[in-house]
């Protein structure tokens, strides 16, 4: 699944980052401390990225009021299309998010993920955190926010989810974008299915 980053021939399309294996994703999250304020925030932040498929700009644009834990929805004010969207997240993010909210809610309105002073977290801080945790977890590949988005897409496809549904989850403007995004896996799946297909015998 290793992919080299390169210029995409399709203008404006996303370039898939290298996805993590399930073991790597688990190790990355385990590397975040559950005993410190920043560790609890970082673990929740990374878990939501991983289990929602949000872009980093979408995640950091969230306000506390944009989160509905009962419905597991996130109201996005800042999206690539420029239009507000409602997106969801997997129940696997519940525990890490609830632990963070116990610290976050008493601070009042503001960014969902913030500094101790209540200010915004910047993309470069998230990238640095991912690099630090990846090193601590012994992950050799470069771990970036977009890689977590790609990891979710890969896991959904392998779980048998339809590309049209994955496209909606990721907030892609078209299914064609998602198809290019997962092209390496859909090609492999097509070959596997062809080899296993129950076709009429040739006489």
Predicted regions and their residues:
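Conserved catalytic core of the tyrosine transesterase superfamily
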Residues: 1-203
